[in-house]
């Protein structure tokens, strides 16, 4: 049996001590049997933690988890913050118990789930870092390479044809040897072009040459790398075509006749869901089949899966060793990528099958969207076209208690329109907006600079992996 390190125990105990009394009072005010049981469990949890009776925490953790997680799944969220607080304290009890039992995989599983659900990172990340390093040292792989993408399986003829009148400008970075380290006359000239023509004017561009030699370009192309080193880690996966599209379909169905809605139980048009999965299950069930698909630009919704906008770098910090920050970002001097929750956001990973779709929206941070593996189509509209884009407010995610927490960068303004196959009779103002859009296809090593406030629509044309480097100019 392992001892639980004081550096982990003390901050966890302080959180429980400071929260459990108020949480218990809030639970009792709900006046139902489950809430009453949670209150009893939390009092037992505090007593056992205070007495360091960690070997008795298993049943308490399981009881709290069952009561809170079932409510989340049934209701699509927690109606009261005390339920989230109960869940988090129960998870911390589970982490403590399984750590002392020396069960590395189970402890990391609970840590991952807690991380995704918004438990305090300062409590989780030190434990996750210790255990993930132990897991890596005990993991060896003799399995053959599993390519995320093979160009012979990519049907380039099905890619969108880029209108030359709407192409995003391409600039170079690190064209010659001097650029490799962000120094030398060639690089300074390249950076001057970027800063004067794009950064200062808030104009999108594609940057070529900088990321080509990042280790992840080849390393992450092998799905076996993720299977061998991180296969048991829990991640949030979006299944089916994008959530907002599904909500629109649901609203339309609710307006149909009684005869039509009577058949809704067999209607597969509402096909978006989110699920916590082991990374290996996501790869084996979705990524590998998609990599073998010779027309992944048209992957049907039931086969679409997306690890979208997730803080996988924080969760698996060893991934930091495989890439660099874009040179232009390092050189600006007046810009910074935020790396902590207090300061902002760290680089995020987007990993998915072909035909994942991100509806048109804008972010409040500038972004270097870097394509690592595969291909993506991106269409951009400037902020001055906002009145022509048929934006709607996504009211459904106002609750902070959804299965996967909301993005810090996504705005409420979003468009449900299919921008690649537009019904101009229904959306005539898009004829005006379409005089001003720009577009591109990103391939491995391409970096797209997207200024804050620019609307963007993104669709993967193959299995794909991208990195977002959001930053804010001082």
Curated annotation (Swiss-Prot):
Among the GO molecular function terms of this UniProt record, one is: 2-oxoglutarate-dependent dioxygenase activity
**Stretches assigned to coiled coil:** none
The organism's superkingdom is given as Eukaryota
Domain JmjC, by residue range, is: 305-474
The protein's matches in InterPro entries, at most eight in alphabetical order, are given as: Cupin_8, JmjC_dom
Q: Where is the composition biased (Low complexity)?
A: 251-261
Under PROSITE patterns, the record lists: JMJC
| Protein name (record) | JmjC domain-containing protein F
Q: Which species is this UniProt entry from? A: Dictyostelium discoideum
């Amino acid at each position: 049996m392992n001892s639980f390190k004081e550096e982990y125990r003390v901050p966890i105990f302080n959180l429980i001590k400071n929260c459990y009394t108020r949480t218990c009072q809030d639970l009792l005010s709900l006046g139902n049997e489950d809430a009453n049981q949670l209150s009893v469990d939390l009092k037992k949890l505090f007593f056992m933690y205070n007495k360091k009776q960690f070997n008795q925490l298993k049943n308490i953790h399981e009881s709290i988890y069952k009561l809170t997680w079932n409510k989340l799944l049934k209701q699509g969220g927690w109606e009261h913050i005390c339920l989230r607080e109960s869940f988090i304290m129960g998870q911390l009890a589970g982490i403590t118990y399984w750590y002392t039992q020396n069960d590395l995989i189970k402890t990391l599983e609970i840590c991952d789930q807690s991380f995704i659900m918004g438990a305090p990172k300062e409590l989780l990340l030190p434990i996750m870092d210790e255990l993930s390093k132990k897991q890596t040292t005990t993991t060896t792989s003799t399995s053959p390479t599993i390519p995320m993408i093979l160009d012979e399986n990519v049907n380039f003829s099905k890619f969108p044809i880029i209108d030359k009148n709407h192409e995003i400008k391409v600039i170079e970075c690190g064209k010659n040897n001097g650029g490799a380290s962000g120094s030398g006359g060639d690089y300074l000239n390249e950076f001057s072009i970027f800063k004067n023509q794009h950064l200062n004017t808030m104009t999108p561009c594609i940057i070529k040459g900088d990321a080509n030699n990042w280790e992840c370009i080849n390393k992450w192309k092998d799905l076996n790398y993720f299977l061998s080193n991180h296969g048991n880690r829990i991640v949030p996966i979006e299944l089916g075509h994008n959530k907002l599209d599904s909500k629109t379909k649901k609203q339309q169905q609710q307006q149909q006749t009684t005869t039509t809605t009577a058949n809704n139980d067999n209607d597969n048009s509402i096909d978006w869901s989110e699920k916590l999965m082991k990374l290996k299950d996501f790869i084996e069930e979705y990524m590998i089949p998609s990599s073998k698909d010779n027309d992944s630009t048209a992957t049907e919704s039931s086969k679409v899966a997306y690890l979208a906008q997730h803080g996988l770098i924080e969760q698996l910090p060893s991934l930091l060793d495989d890439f660099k920050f874009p040179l232009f970002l390092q050189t600006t001097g007046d810009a910074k990528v935020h790396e902590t929750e207090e300061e902002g956001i760290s680089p995020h990973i987007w990993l998915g099958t072909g035909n994942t779709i991100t509806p048109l929206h804008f972010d409040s941070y500038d972004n270097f969207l870097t394509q690592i593996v595969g291909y993506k189509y991106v269409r951009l509209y400037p902020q001055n076209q906002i009145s022509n884009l048929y934006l709607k407010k996504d009211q459904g995610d106002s609750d902070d208690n959804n299965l996967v927490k909301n993005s810090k960068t996504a705005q409420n303004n979003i468009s449900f329109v299919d921008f690649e196959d537009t019904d101009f009779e229904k959306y005539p103002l898009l004829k005006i907006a379409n005089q001003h859009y720009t577009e591109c296809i990103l391939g491995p090593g391409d970096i797209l600079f997207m200024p804050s406030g620019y609307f963007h629509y993104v669709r993967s044309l193959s299995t794909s992996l991208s990195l977002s480097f959001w930053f804010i100019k001082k």
